[in-house]
């Protein structure tokens, strides 16, 4: 999720790629530590934009996280393709970002092994 968020952010105006990576990473943190995401956001020193994206799917980061989750779950019919194309995220760009993110994640896991 973090790798895909970072890849998509590279095509999303106004969203920093490393912030997007952090967003994707932290969006799954509650599953790893068995603490509700709300409590984690209160304890961690995150920017307001990250907190709002994680808790309410607000702002551009929230929209990005929603997109990443829909892509993960293959909810293609729920995507607003016209809106995505307006910001430069055509289907081929998204497809390439997805494949690149899978490769990034594999390389990351291999580097940690």
For the regions a language model picked out, list residue spans one by one.
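Metal-dependent nucleotide-binding catalytic modules
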Residues: 1-113
């Amino acid at each position: 999720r973090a790798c895909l968020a970072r890849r998509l952010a590279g095509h999303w105006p106004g969203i920093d790629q490393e912030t997007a990576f952090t967003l994707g990473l932290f969006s799954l943190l509650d599953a790893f530590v068995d603490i509700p995401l709300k409590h984690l956001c209160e304890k961690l020193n995150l920017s307001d934009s990250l907190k709002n994206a994680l808790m309410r799917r607000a702002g551009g980061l929230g929209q990005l996280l929603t997109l990443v989750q829909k892509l993960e779950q293959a909810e293609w019919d729920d995507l607003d393709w016209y809106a995505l194309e307006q910001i430069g995220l055509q289907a081929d760009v998204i497809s390439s970002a997805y494949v690149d993110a899978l490769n990034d994640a594999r390389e990351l896991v291999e580097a940690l092994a």
